[in-house]
């Protein structure tokens, strides 16, 4: 029926993207979501025969949630690295004095480890579950993958906020080695 979802592959010369609006990020770098109008035409052979629900459940759900979580972990790890550099530089400027951000740095390192462990647990769950196509389509597996995504996305916001607190204005500026 016309409401069924299908998965289709398009080659570069078979589609066009027309930008419809520009996203105003209000200072939030990395959140660009410009709007586009997608137009495409291709032979029917490029439509996957398998129902989209099966494709999504058996590969797309886990792959996208785990990939997003891993990317977010990388973003958070970079922010923590910059915060570490900031604290290290502060310690060098004032030997013998614990920099104010040192305690927050310990806290944020623990949070980063939590995200990493979450992603690894999700990867292991997927590796085990993908052996059984029925299990991949189960509600339990979908909840597990959603939990990986939600947990990762929520914790990295806290990590970024901690890194910004550690680096202060130098973390907000775009042209410093501590830019978050």
Per-region residue spans from a language model:
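A short core secondary-structure module
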Residues: 1-17
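Residue-level signal for pocket-adjacent positions within structured domains
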Residues: 12-14, 18, 55, 167
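Short beta-alpha junctions and helix-cap segments that line functional grooves
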Residues: 20-24
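Glycine-rich beta->alpha junctions and the first turn(s) of the following alpha-helix
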Residues: 25-113
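Amphipathic alpha-helices that form helix-helix packing interfaces
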Residues: 69, 76, 83, 108, ...
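Hydrophobic/aromatic-lined pockets within catalytic cores
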Residues: 84, 88, 127, 164, ...
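A beta-strand-loop signature enriched in Asp, Gly, Thr, and Trp
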Residues: 87-146
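Glycine-rich phosphate/cofactor-binding loops in nucleotide/flavin-utilizing enzymes
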Residues: 169-180
């Amino acid at each position: 029926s016309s409401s069924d979802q299908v998965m289709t592959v398009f080659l570069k010369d078979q589609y066009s993207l027309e930008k419809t609006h520009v996203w105003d990020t209000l200072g939030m770098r990395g959140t660009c979501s410009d709007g586009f109008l997608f137009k495409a035409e291709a032979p029917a052979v490029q439509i996957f025969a398998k129902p989209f629900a099966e494709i999504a459940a058996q590969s797309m759900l886990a792959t996208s949630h785990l990939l997003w979580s891993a990317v977010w972990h990388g973003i958070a790890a970079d922010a923590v690295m910059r915060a570490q550099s900031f604290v290290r530089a502060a310690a060098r400027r004032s030997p013998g004095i614990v920099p104010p951000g040192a305690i927050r740095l310990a806290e944020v390192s623990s949070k980063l480890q939590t995200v990493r462990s979450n992603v690894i647990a999700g990867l292991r769950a997927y590796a085990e579950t993908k052996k059984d196509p029925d299990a991949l389509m189960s509600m339990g597996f979908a909840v597990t993958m959603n939990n990986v995504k939600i947990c990762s996305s929520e914790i990295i916001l806290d990590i970024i906020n901690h890194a910004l607190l550690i680096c202060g204005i130098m973390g907000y500026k775009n042209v410093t080695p501590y830019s978050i």
